[in-house]
Each structure stands twice: as structure tokens, then as C-alpha cells.
């Protein structure tokens, strides 16, 4: 099951119904016995897709608008549908989407209830209307109810005929439902009955009694008997009523979450664009304030000469006044170079309360003119004026649909003109109101775009637009929009300037950290609040003084006209020729009905989701997810809507908003908000090459299963007695496993003792209690938080106070043991048994923190219990430190005296190997050595054994067993948690070795000089070897499990012969040879699924596409002054680290890598040449980059062409010089990295 946006389901249903109604690809068959002169019935059966379709078409003597209203009105369904007993709306999401309930009956069934999700398309401009329905499963509904696939009506207006329409209805069902007689109202009386018989008996919501022709007959009968009542109301009034509803919903749904792209965003307005199949939609929405009342603004917007204030209309004409508040207007609208004639409906409302509104939208026009193939239509548009003190606050939304502009440049110009028009009309409205009130001398006119008539005289729209006028309009738009994208939408201009200045300084100092920005913003806001309070106090004092003077000197009242003139003159000087704007308007309640100013950026549409089944048996079934919604005020909005409102803000702006009031503080502390911020922040989700996650232990298990299965098949089938014995053994094993799971103790490593839920899981064996109410969760947290870690004597008493659901998860017979383990992990001395060997070796062992917690397999709490605000802040700091390569701590791990050969880390532990035959085990929390091991022969390689976790509770790592490879070919496994260190296993696959790789469980990869061996540990079998893998000594070998080139894994090798090779791990076949370096290749690292990075003595890094490895795809000349010895790729943060003989480590930041066009190709032919390859690649980097173009061909023309990889940035960020000798090895993870050098120094870098 998954949640799907209800709008997406609506669009899908409507699209499916339209496709069935108008598609010419469906081979319909006309049903002659069902059709008549008035209607035509078609059908189609597809046994391949298992679906049956039927379609009916008829014409009616009624307008399409009235037909749509008739079918939409659910209360009238029972009036024209003789088999419908009851019909009503269960839930209304908006004026186009509803859940309805229908109750039917027919001769074969006494009663049938159906719940349907109804979606509508309403387009009066094209005179096209759609009503689509499909089954929906409610909480109290029948799960096994018959599922109705998308079906419904399509209503079209006939050109040139106002009161006539064509209606098409479609329905579909699964053939399987017909065969099994699952469809209500259908019953096959005889298996030999003809297929078409069920058409008369099938019952669908769009039909009456199942007969496709019956629906036309019943509707036509109802219309003929009630035609006067149906056509009494002018349909244009209904159009405007729906336009008013749609505008309110469009405020909340025209945002990036619904597929809109922001073209321009200013402090008080924004322009959004959404592409369509035939053109695109444009929305301009925003707000402005003025000192004029809403009633006065409505008089100007709805004045006698329509749209006189709109400077983009060449001319307008009143067609008809429908009533006192709605009229039809013909306008000549200029969009850039073209004048388009269209019809609009415009309405005005005043009240209730101190409120007014003006709405308009395009309708089907008999005189509509298309200029140069370009069409422009108005979608529902409005200006809403709310009383604000003595003035008003205006919220506006302008929406148009554009078709026909063929080039991106023309689209850009039209969008620019639309944005400029929005600004020009705001100014024009203020100018017109100012003239109407006679205040033109008080305020300077705001800049507007003049109309063609005003600018060009009597040229007229029929002659064409002069080039001078086009240039003037474009220049005006450029001036108005020059700084359009630099405005903010939350902080004040003063704070914004300060923040920009601070950000510039911080960027110069590489110190742009979120906490410093937050502190600066908080200080600025506090200063602004103090200044505002001081100004208000001064104004109050001045008013009091003025009142005293007025009372003491009544004779001065005669001088008031002179004072007013002086005040007006002063006001004229202070007002600037710019558009006034405000930010927040939650100030007034305009009427008893609760109508109030609602800011343009508030979401006014209820979010609704549906559960959609992933099951193939119930493919289209959807379930309702209930959401409660209120528009009465911000305090009454549900949290879902609050999060939608705040989700578009940045972290800094959210902190600023939290300082406004207590309600905003509570809302901005929501974990959902910070969780969305975290998951949407590109800093945490860089576009870097990533590999699929591989779990090593499962690989060996799968192989064992394959081997055991093959063995069984070779031995033949087992006897019945053996099978019964196997079943008994399996049952016994299952019982034993269940008992062990009940008795085992939950792994306490890395438990957060400060988190009540995490602490509770100690007693519930790691199980998180489910089905707890929010109140119960708070109570449980309160009880668990009372546990005193310094005195655990009250644990049993507190446990008894927990709810039954939680108490049932705790086994009381193991409570004492869990308290004992809890005392150990919390740092208290153990009272039972001997002291832990870990305490002997690392007594000063602090608890893991956010910076050094490195165990990838440690306990990860459920997202519900994560403090997302702290998590976001911490991750933001860490990511910034990685980008700037500024570790919070560098810990030296001292103990070696000679060169470091290898470094491995796991959790908060690490292993280092030096040429002095010594291995050291480290506690990364403290930097202390907690164990030593010295081999008889030189140690070359080490690796943690991940096949089995440690039997002891140890907070540093889950794994304590280590594979050790020696120079004499010996492989030893030790467990360093035991003191002294215990040798578990020893084997000697070969006599000499230069290195080992223990990545693959149960397998050893060994190389010596130019030879590679691959051994099976359990059988002591040499799986394969290559005696001449390279012509010179192998410098490194590395296994990559389950690679795209081979499901079983591949092997990388590098050599002094200037090459690197890729081998198939299963059989040792050479897949690719990477040739391109001028000196020895010393190291290699996989990058993503298809690439590899090599480092060489020639001081360069080269990137290879392993599917076309005839040459490298990019080369990076580093700033190293010596040979590159080691590289490591930390894919979580997109960082490549390279170590060199010059003692430096250089970090490279990877980002903006587009790997979406990479597809899996056929397995390469193992002849060192892929074949049929042609590619050109480039990359952006601050270092010297070599761009290569390669083309090679082979005789095998069946191999498909491999797509190009689009590289991203590979930026040299910083050079670290903490090592005094050559860097020999690097091991990295998300928390930091460890580096070893030639003089034996090991450094731990924590980020």
C-alpha cells in the first residue's frame, strides 16, 4: 500500500475517460440492436488485456453547461435514474472532487451500495465537461465489494449551437469479473448464452439498469419534462460561482508541489509556469496594500468602462449586464506583439463586512480571433480586497493559458510581459483610485505601461503594433523585473541587507554556518522590535500632546484646514513612487461569519491522500485517508496544512518566524517540518555517483543455498521418511529459534540513554511498542524518564506502571539480567561475574557522540523518535565541515615506529598494520591502543570478519574478529576482545604474498608479484589463479562484490606496468585493461556502479567508464608534488581523498553528477575491447582537466552503443599537511577518515 495524492488520481481517471471517449486507436464495434437514430452504442473486448469496453454517444437539446449541472447535482440522480434509490455526497474535497454514495436496485438484485470517487473537469471556455468515477474503499466499507474501473460522461458543446450538446459515456470492466459473474446485476442463465446478453444486465454507475441505451432514454425523458426548470438559471452565473471557488483553491495548489515552476519571485508577488501538451499555464499571485477602502477599490475594478485600469487591453466593450454583479465583456487583449479578441465574464462582490472582490474568466467566444496561431485565455482570476485599518489589503491571482508560441525565446518574452503587466496593473489601480478620490496632487503617479491607443494614437490594433511600442514595453518590463529574483519573502529589507552583508563576509572567511546566521538574525529582529516599540511610544506621546493642545486652545480649530494642507504636503514628500506592500495581515475579523484577511501565500486547499494497493489483484482499488480541515484561521489549521505553508521556507526564515508569536514557535518546532527540510536540503543529498548497498553475509548464505540445492538434485529425490524427518527437524529448529529470540538480550551497543524510547527498548528486546495514542506515548516517556541510572532500584516499580501494550513486551523473568546489562553500559560497576575485559583495557571510554559514532550496523531509532531539528542542525554543520575540510578534531594514534601498511575501521574501533610486524587495535573515542598483536612474519593486510557479531557486549563495534594476512602466505583469524588476544584459526594457502583481500566472506584473494590467487577457505580449494596478471609487480588489488559488470563481483588490480585491470571474480577472466597513465598505477577506487578512479606516480587521477574502458573519460592533474599512493571515496558526502608521497592529503568535492541516462548494457566480451563505442565527455573542475574523445570498433556489431556519462564537478577543495612523511593509506566513512604515513603516524580526522 502507498499514499497517492488525490489530484493525481483525479487526473488519471479523467484522462482515462477522455482517452476512451475520443481515441481512434480502439477498434470499436457498433451494436446495431442497441443503437437507434438518437444514439449509437459501441463495444470492444480485449482478451489479451482482459478488459471489456463500451461507449455510447447521443445528442441532446440542452446546453452542455446545463447538462453538466444536471449530472453533477447528486441530489437529482434519483429523479432521472429510475433504479437509484439514494445518492448523496459523503465528502467534498473541492468543487471538482467528491466521494459519493449510490444505492441501486434492479430485478436481479434487491439492493446495491457503491462508494465512488468522482472527479470532474470543468472548461466553459472549450465547452468541454467530464465527470469520471471509480470505486473507493472507505473505512467501514465492504473490502470485497465489486471494483468499478474508471468510467463516466464526457459532455461537448456543438459549435454554433448554444443550446445543444453531445454526450459520450464510457464504461469498462474486467472480463474475468464477467466470467466469474462478480458484476452486480449480471447473471448468466445459460453457458450458451450470447456474449452480448450481459450488456443488458450489467449495472454501472453511469448506466441505468445496465442497458447502455437506457441512460440516454431516461435522461432525455427527464429533460423534456423539466426543460423550463433546467434552463431557468443563466448558466453564466453558475460559471462565475465556480470561478470564485476555483480561485480560492488555486491559491494553494499553484506551487512547485503541484508541478508549477517559479519564473519570478518578489517580496509581494510571484510568477509560476506549468507546461501542457498544447502550451502552458501562467499564474501571477501576490498582494499589495493601499490606503483606500475595499469598496472603493471594487468600484474602480468594476467601473462602467470595463477594465479601463488594465493597460494591456487595446479596447473593451460591454456585451451584456447579466445582473447587477455579473456582466459579459468583449476585450481586445495584447500579449506582446499580438492583439487577441476574447469574451470574459466579470463579477463583483461587496461584503459581507469590510470586503470586496472582482473575478473574471474567459468563456467560449463566437468572435474569438487567433493571431498568428496564438491563443490566450483567462483562467479564473480575481482581486480580493480585505479591510485593513483605514485602508485595505489586496490579494490577487491572475491565471492565463497560452497556446501557439513555438520558440523558447517567444515563451520567455510572453512570460516577461505577463510579469510586467502584473506590476503595471497594480500601479494603474492605485493611480485610478487616486484620481477618483481627487488626490492626484498628493501622490505622484506610479509608473505603468501605456495602452496602444495612449501611446500610438489612432493607429489601432488592426494595423499592427509599431516596433516602437514593442521596444517600449520590453524596456519597461526589464526595468521592473531587473531585481525581481533578488527579493526575499519573509525578512525585512533592513535585515536582508544586513544578512547579505554578513553572508558575503562569511563566504570570504569560509565560515558560513547556520548557527551564526541564526544568532545574527535573532539579534537583528530584536533590534527591529525595540525600534518599533520606541517609535510607537513616541507616536503615542505626540498624540497625547496634540490632544492637550487641542483642549487648551479651541480657537485653533479654525486653523485645521491649513494644518491639513501642511500634513498633505509633508505626506506627498514622504511617499515614494513605488508600490506599497505589507508582509503579515492576521489583524482583523471582518464579519461575524469569520471572514478574515488571508495572505496570498497561505494554502487554502485541503490536502487529500488516498491509499492505493500495490496488489495485482486489486490494482485500481483506492482507500480514503481522512483529513480534517478548517479555514477559520491559522490557529485552527491542521498540522498538515501548516507544514505545507512553512515547507517552502529556509531554515533561517523558519527560525525568524518562530520569534513572531507563540503559535509560530510551536509550529516551527514540528519534527515533520525539520524532517522535510532535512530530506529536501541538497547539501545532504548531493548528486554524486553511488553504488547499490551490498550485505556481505547474505552473499555467502545465498551461495551455500545454491550449493546445497545443487547437491540435492545430484543425489536424487529423498524418500518419504527422510522428508518427514526433515520437516520434524525444521519444526524443532523453529521452536529453538523462537525460544532463543525470547531469551536473548537486546544489543545495547550505542543505546542513547538520554532517549526514553531508546532506553525502553532495552527492556522490550528492541521492539518499539505500536498502536499507542499520542497521550500514551507521552505517558510512557514520562515513566521511563524517571529511571535513575545511578540507582536502578526503582526500575521494577516503574515498569509496572507502563500500559498493558508495553508491559506485554517485557519478560519479567529476564528483568534482572537486563538491569545488570544496563548498569554495565551506563558506566556503573558490575556486581555479578568477572569484570569485563574491555573495562580493563579502556576504562576511560566515553560514550559515542554524533561525531565519532561510526557503526553503520548500530541501532537506528525509528524516524518518529528522531529530534529532526537537532538532526538537521548537526548534519548541516557536519556537511559544511566536509565541504570546507575543517575537522572538529584531529586525534593522533601513536604507537607505531615504521611505515603504516593498512588501516581498517569498524564502528568506533580501528586496526592499523605497520612494517614492524605489529598490529594495533584502537579505541577511536579516546585514541588509546586497547590491544596489540605481533606476527611471526610481516603483516600485510587486515579486515574485519562481518560474518558473525561478537558474543560480548562491546560499545565500540559489533565485530571483533579480524583476518590477518602475513608475508609468508599465512592467514590468521583473531578475536581482539579476548585478553590476551585469542587466535581462532590459521591457514596457509600460499608460500609468499604481497597482499590479501578478505572482502568476500569465505574467500581469500592473494597476490604476489604478478600472480593472483583466489581461494575457498572452507574447502581449501584454489578457485582460480592468474600467473601473469601484469608484466610488473602488482601494487594493489581490491574486490567489489556484486558489480554491474558481473553479478558475482569483480577484482581491480593495479601495477607498476602503468596499467590497471578488471577481472571477473567467478572465473578470473580479464574484463578490461585500463591503460593511460605515464607511470606506475598505485591505487584504484570504485566510483558509483560504472566508474573507477585510479591514482598514479604521474600525480594524476583518471576516471574510467568500466563499460568502455579503452581509454579514460577524464583526467585530473592534482596539486600533489609527489606520487599518489592511496585514494578513498566517501560517497555519502561525495568526497574523494588522495594521499601522496609529499605528505599531503587533498580532498575533492563531487556534485551535480547526472547519471540518469546510464543504462545497463549487455555483459562485455572479455577480449579487452568492448567495441562499438563512441562518446565525448567533459567535466567542470578547478584543476586541470583533460577531455577525451574515444572511438573504437570491432567486428561484433551486435553490441549496443553505450550511453555517455555526464560528469559533474570534481573540485579540489583543500590540501591538508598534518603528516610529515608520505601518506600510505586512507580509510574513510561518513564521520571522518583515518590516514597512515611512512613514519608510523596515524591520524584520526573527525568531522
From Swiss-Prot:
Q: Where is the START domain?
A: 1-214
One annotated GO biological process: culmination involved in sorocarp development
Q: Name where the WD repeats lie.
A: 895-934, 945-984, 988-1025, 1029-1073, 1076-1114, 1119-1158, 1218-1247
Q: Which residues form the F-box domain?
A: 631-677
Family matches, as SUPFAM superfamilies: Bet v1-like, F-box domain, WD40 repeat-like
Answer whether the UniProt record assigns the keyword Repeat to this protein.
Answer: yes
Per the UniProt record, the lineage of the source organism begins with: Eukaryota, Amoebozoa, Evosea, Eumycetozoa, Dictyostelia
GO MF term (any one): lipid binding
- Family annotation (Gene3D superfamilies): 1.20.1280.50, 3.30.530.20, YVTN repeat-like/Quinoprotein amine dehydrogenase
Please tell me whether the keyword Repeat is annotated for this protein: yes
Q: Which ranges are annotated Low complexity under compositional bias?
A: 552-566, 707-719, 726-744
The job of this chain, per UniProt, is described as:
Substrate recognition component of a SCF (SKP1-CUL1-F-box protein) E3 ubiquitin-protein ligase complex which mediates the ubiquitination and subsequent proteasomal degradation of target proteins. May target the cAMP phosphodiesterase regA for degradation leading to an increase in cAMP and PKA activity. Promotes development of prestalk cells as opposed to prespores within the developing fruiting body. Required for culmination and fruiting body development.
- UniProt gene name: fbxA
One matching Pfam family: START
Q: Subunit notes for this chain?
A: Component of an SCF complex including at least culA. Formation of this complex appears to require activity of the MAP kinase erk2. Interacts with regA.
Query: Any idea what this protein is called?
Result: F-box/WD repeat-containing protein A
Q: Which keywords are on file for this protein?
A: Developmental protein, Differentiation, Fruiting body, Repeat, Sporulation, Ubl conjugation pathway, WD repeat
Q: Which PROSITE patterns match?
A: FBOX (PS50181), START (PS50848), WD_REPEATS_1 (PS00678), WD_REPEATS_2 (PS50082), WD_REPEATS_REGION (PS50294)
